[in-house]
């Protein structure tokens, strides 16, 4: 299923006047925060499109991205910092507890080709933070780690979080 779509992006450059030039360019200065797809066709294997019996809208907002933009830019007044989903109130309680338990500090570094010790620590914090959130939502929805299907996926996520935890 597919159809016409639209995306909402935020221009994070100092002047905010790139006029869409950074959209879909993988630039950290332009972040997609929302998309809308007006589902009305099925994409056929021959490249054509067949109308669907029912039309609907698929839309989604990146909560963490919106929080990151608002918090990192000080409500759109300061564009000097790099926007990161992890430098927000969404992840700070998790990272504070990880700091307490591990004795290591999260410093918001980005990994390089040959990461140094702090970059490895920060990657571990981000992986564990993401996985804790995934586990929390999944378990709250009634999914338990197990040996088959989605339960096995959850088990693998848990094991990966533990593996990264051991690096701290």
Predicted regions and their residues:
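Structured aminoacyl-transfer and RNA-binding surfaces used for tRNA recognition/handling
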Residues: 1-168
């Amino acid at each position: 299923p597919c159809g016409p779509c639209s995306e909402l992006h935020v221009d994070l450059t100092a002047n905010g006047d790139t006029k869409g030039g950074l959209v879909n360019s993988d630039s950290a200065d332009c972040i997609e925060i929302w998309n809308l797809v007006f589902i009305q066709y099925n994409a056929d294997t021959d490249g054509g499109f067949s109308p669907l019996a029912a039309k609907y809208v698929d839309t989604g907002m990146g909560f963490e991205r919106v929080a990151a933009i608002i918090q990192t830019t000080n409500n759109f007044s300061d564009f000097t910092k790099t926007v990161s989903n992890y430098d927000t109130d969404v992840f700070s309680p998790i990272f504070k507890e990880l700091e307490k338990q591990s004795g290591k500090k999260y410093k918001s570094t980005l990994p390089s080709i040959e990461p140094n010790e702090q970059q490895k620590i920060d990657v571990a914090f981000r992986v564990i933070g993401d996985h804790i959130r995934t586990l929390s939502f999944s378990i709250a929805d009634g999914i338990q780690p197990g040996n088959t299907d989605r339960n096995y996926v959850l088990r693998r996520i848990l094991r990966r979080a533990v593996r990264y935890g051991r690096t701290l």
